[in-house]
Amino acid sequence: MKSGPGIQAAIDLTAGAAGGTACVLTGQPFDTIKVKMQTFPDLYKGLTDCFLKTYAQVGLRGFYKGTGPALMAYVAENSVLFMCYGFCQQFVRKVAGMDKQAKLSDLQTAAAGSFASAFAALALCPTELVKCRLQTMYEMEMSGKIAKSHNTIWSVVKGILKKDGPLGFYHGLSSTLLQEVPGYFFFFGGYELSRSFFASGRSKDELGPVHLMLSGGVAGICLWLVVFPVDCIKSRIQVLSMYGKQAGFIGTLLSVVRNEGIVALYSGLKATMIRAIPANGALFVAYEYSRKMMMKQLEAY
């Protein structure tokens, strides 16, 4: 069966959803630690301290707070990201005056990923907001910033709708865009350059799961080294806007640097770097293999 644009988009969307699911299931505990340290750096001395205190306060389940929204966030983001990635590759070919079937360079592929991330940000922002608030609910309650409440997905969603209406789900959208667009240039660039390195003259499609895992890990590290300070500001805006009007990106950035120093922008970086290899490796292994499987099934008809 011939693969039309609609069928190809559906395959990319489904494979992206599989990748997003694998990413969350692999890296959620470290993501929780990252968000806690970004939002409340004064409460924790480091990664180990945050881990031990979280376990002592709320047990193992504390590391999986926000897993539901995280699954929704990453499945939504990666579904849209990889679906639009195919369209954006065609856009890059058109701009570069290339044939529709021409192979893109690694840098051109990175540019396509960057364009696709702008669309993914619109799907990511609402679910990321709910996830971050759930992950830091304990700290918000203990610091007296909010009253004790039922910290469930539905209670957070109702709180956002009641306080800010539907647009409240887009607190931190500008920060998300500032993070996603440049970040995914380095994400896809790092992934494709790593695959080219491991392929060593062979086709990239011949790479096995270990090399795909390592390439995904490099992609994640490239992404987070570039955008981590922006992600820190995004987390602050999304969490702290829960109890009052929060300054925008520039205002929050200046406040953090002035009151806590530049180092505060990198609080939680270690947890993110540890998470990057297994989580992003799992993302690309799941994406590549599920996509190959669906393409084979399509060709069999």
Curated annotation (Swiss-Prot):
User: Which Pfam families has this protein been placed in?
Assistant: Mito_carr
Question: Which catalytic reaction applies to this protein?
Answer: L-ornithine(out) + L-lysine(in) = L-ornithine(in) + L-lysine(out); L-histidine(in) + L-ornithine(out) + H(+)(in) = L-histidine(out) + L-ornithine(in) + H(+)(out); L-homoarginine(in) + L-ornithine(out) = L-homoarginine(out) + L-ornithine(in); L-citrulline(in) + L-ornithine(out) + H(+)(in) = L-citrulline(out) + L-ornithine(in) + H(+)(out)
Task: Please give the Gene3D superfamilies that the UniProt record associates with this protein.
Answer: Mitochondrial carrier domain (1.50.40.10)
Keyword DNA repair included in the entry's annotation:
no
Q: What keyword terms does UniProt attach to this protein?
A: Antiport, Membrane, Mitochondrion, Mitochondrion inner membrane, Repeat, Transmembrane, Transmembrane helix, Transport
- TM spans (from-to): 5-25, 68-88, 110-130, 168-188, 210-230, 237-257
Q: What is the effect of changing Q179H?
A: Does not significantly change the substrate specificity
Q: So which tissues is this one expressed in?
A: Expressed in liver, testis, spleen, lung, pancreas, and small intestine and expressed poorly in other tissues.
Per the record, GO CC terms? Answer: mitochondrial inner membrane; mitochondrion
Q: GO biological process: any one? A: urea cycle
Q: How is its activity regulated?
A: Inhibited by pyridoxal 5'-phosphate, N-ethylmaleimide, spermine and spermidine.
The Solcar repeats lie at 7-91, 104-197, 207-293
Q: Where in the cell is it found?
A: Mitochondrion membrane; Mitochondrion inner membrane
Q: Name one GO molecular function term.
A: L-arginine transmembrane transporter activity
Keyword Repeat carried by entry: yes
Taxonomically, the superkingdom here is: Eukaryota
Instruction: Kindly give the SUPFAM superfamilies that the UniProt entry links to this protein.
Output: Mitochondrial carrier (SSF103506)
The membrane topology of this protein is:
Multi-pass membrane protein
Q: What is the effect of changing Q179R?
A: Ornithine homo-exchange is enhanced 18-fold. Vmax value 33-fold higher than wild-type
Q: What does this protein do?
A: Mitochondrial transporter of the positively charged amino acids ornithine, lysine and arginine, and the neutral amino acid citrulline. In addition, transports the basic amino acids histidine, homoarginine, and asymmetric dimethylarginine (aDMA), but not symmetric DMA, and the D-forms of lysine, arginine, ornithine and histidine. Functions by both counter-exchange and uniport mechanisms.
Family indicated by similarity? Belongs to the mitochondrial carrier (TC 2.A.29) family.
Q: Extra notes?
A: In mice, SLC25A2/ORNT2 is a pseudogene.
Q: What is this protein called?
A: Mitochondrial ornithine transporter 2
